[in-house]
Amino acid sequence: MNADVHKNDPASPGTWEAASALAGKFMTFKLGNEEYGIEILKVREIIGLMEITRVPRVTPWIRGVINLRGKVVPVVDLRVKFGMSPTAATEQTVIIVVQCAIGGRELTMGILVDQVLEVLPLEASQIEPPPSFGTAEVDAGFILGVAKAEKRVIFLLDIGKVLSASEALEMATAQTAQA
């Protein structure tokens, strides 16, 4: 093994210290064949797919807005945001409503996912640091870590970092445009 492989790896030489802070319950879901998780405390509710009103002139990953009990909530298509094809509506497609801080603002948004799997309790020993992509220009700052559960690999997302501050502003603009 190359000696430089773990040079900046927080997991070397011992255990990854941040794993204990990440241990807890995660809502897991699928996008395509990949499995992701977000901290359960960020999840407000899960709703079935409903009519999403398109907002003109917004980024393609902003699917639109929904009326959730009188409140206008922007909806992000995570598949598109992550460079996949748009989410197709199936019986398992849902919107996970989350609350997070982005760019210093509290934001409620919906994230469109292919399927919710389970609430998964994770221990520190099951969580590894985000993968290093070497010198490749890959923005993986939104990945908290990678969990190993049974034979599955789950990318743990920092939902507050999936969007940049400017993208959050665009979301807020989409939200107020339809209010």
Question: What spans do the regions from the language model cover?
Answer:
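An acidic, low-aromatic, low-complexity terminal/linker signal
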Residues: 1-179
